[in-house]
Amino acid sequence: MQSWSSAPVPIVPGRGPELRLYDTADRQVRPVAPGNTATMYVCGITPYDATHLGHAATYLAFDLIHRLWLDLGHEVRYVQNVTDVDDPLFERADRDGVDWRDLAAQEVALFREDMAALRVLSPHDYVGATEAVAEIIELVEKLLASGAAYVLDGEHPDVYYRSDATLQFGYESGYDRDTMLGLFEQRGGDPGRPGKNDALDALLWRAARPGEPSWPSPFGPGRPGWHIECAAIALSRVGSGLDVQGGGSDLIFPHHEFTAAHAECVTGERRFARHYVHAGMIGWDGHKMSKSRGNLVLVSGLRAEGVNPAAVRLGLLAGHYRADRFWSQQVLDEAVGRLQRWRAATTLPAGPDAAAVVARVRQYLADDLNTPKAIAALDGWATDALDYGGHDEVAPRLVASTIDALLGVDL
C-alpha cells in the first residue's frame, strides 16, 4: 500500500541523550536501546471514517520517537498497518450503500493527506491487512499445528487462539481476569460465544459468511481476525524483538496483549517488543473522541476551515503524550499564538545563544517525550529573543531547525 511523502528532516548539530520511554508492561520509564536500525510497529486506522484528533495525537507521539531516533543517528524501520477488512468498515459501507473496498480506499487517501499535512514522517512499510492475508494464514497454520489454536465446532468453523497458550499472557496490560473480560466485550471480543474453550479466547480466522469477503485457506475460506493481522505483518516485516510496539491506550487490551501473545507463541520469545508504548486519549465535549460516539474533531475539517496544520500539531504536542487530555478552542488559540511568536523570534537577524536551549529540548524529549517542558524551553528562548534581542546570528536558524527536526513544526 502506498504511504505518503515526508518533508526532509534537518540535521541539527550535536547529539542528545539516549531515549527513555514509559513501558506499559514494566510500568516504568526505562532506556530504549536499539541497534543501528531502530524498529517500531504502530497500529494504523480502520478506514471507515476520517482522521480525528485522537488518531492524530497518537501518530504524532510515535513521530517524535521516529525523529529522536533519526537525531541520534539510527536508521528507522517503521511499520504501520491498515485494518482494511473489519466489521465496522463493512457496516459503514453497507449503511452508505458503497463497496467496502471503495470506502477503505477513500478514507486511506484522506488519512495520507492528513498525515502529510501534519508532517508525520511516513512509515517504511504501510501495509493493508488485505495485502498480508498469505502471511496471516501461515501464522494461523503455525498456531493450529502447535495446539495454540483450535477450530470451533458448528455451522461456522471459526479458528480461535487459546488465551492460555503462553504462560506470560497478561503481562503487558497487567489486568486481572474480570477487567480483561469487560474490556474484551467492549472492544470487539466475544466472551459469550458458545463452544469456546475459554471466554477470553480470541478469534484468529472468521469462517466465510454470506455477503462478507473471504479468502481461501487450508482451514476453510474466511477472513482474518483483528489481532493476528498485526502479529503477522510485524513478524513478516521486522521480525520479533521490536524496539517499540505502539498505539493508543485503548489498544493495550485486548489488541496489543493478543498481538504479542500470537507472536510469542510462534517465536518462543518472552517478549514480542522491548517497549510497549501507549498514547493517551483526546477528549472533546466531555468524552473521549471516538468514531462510535461521533464527538469528532476531524483533521480534514480543521484544514478545510483554514486552520494551519502546524498549529494543530503544536496544540496536540502541548500536552504530554501519555496524558488523557481535552482539545478545545483555547488549546488551538494558544498554539496559533505560540506559532506566531516562534516565527517572529526565528526570523530575527540575530538572537540569544541557542546551544543551551537546543540541549534542553533534546534532554526533555529524550525523557519520555516531555513536550510540555521542551515547548516551555523554546517559549523562554523566543521571549528573550523578542524582548531583548541577541548577537548570535546563527541562533534563530538553529532554533528553527531544531523545532523542525525534533518537533516536526515547520516555521
Swiss-Prot record:
Listed cofactors: Zn(2+)
Binding residues annotated for Zn(2+), in chain numbering: C43, C230, H255
The keyword ATP-binding is annotated on this UniProt entry: yes
Keyword terms of this UniProt record: ATP-binding, Ligase, Metal-binding, Nucleotide-binding, Zinc
Motif ('ERGGDP' region): 186-191
Motif 'KMSKS' region mapped to chain: 288-292
UniProt key word Metal-binding: yes
Catalytic activity: 1D-myo-inositol 2-amino-2-deoxy-alpha-D-glucopyranoside + L-cysteine + ATP = 1D-myo-inositol 2-(L-cysteinylamino)-2-deoxy-alpha-D-glucopyranoside + AMP + diphosphate + H(+)
Any one cellular-component term (Gene Ontology): cytosol
Residues that bind L-cysteinyl-5'-AMP: C43, G44, I45, T46, T58, N81, V82, T83, W226, G248, S249, D250, I282
Record's cofactor remark: Binds 1 zinc ion per subunit.
Enzyme class: ligase
GO biological process: cysteinyl-tRNA aminoacylation; mycothiol biosynthetic process
GO terms of molecular function: ATP binding; cysteine-glucosaminylinositol ligase activity; cysteine-tRNA ligase activity; zinc ion binding
InterPro entries per UniProt: Cys-tRNA/MSH_ligase (IPR024909), Mycothiol_ligase_MshC (IPR017812), Rossmann-like_a/b/a_fold (IPR014729), tRNA-synt_1_cat_dom (IPR032678), tRNAsynth_Ia_anticodon-bd (IPR009080)
EC number: 6.3.1.13
Motif 'HIGH' region in this chain: 45-55
Subunit architecture: Monomer.
Function: Catalyzes the ATP-dependent condensation of GlcN-Ins and L-cysteine to form L-Cys-GlcN-Ins.
HAMAP family: MshC
Family listed: Belongs to the class-I aminoacyl-tRNA synthetase family. MshC subfamily.
Protein name: L-cysteine:1D-myo-inositol 2-amino-2-deoxy-alpha-D-glucopyranoside ligase
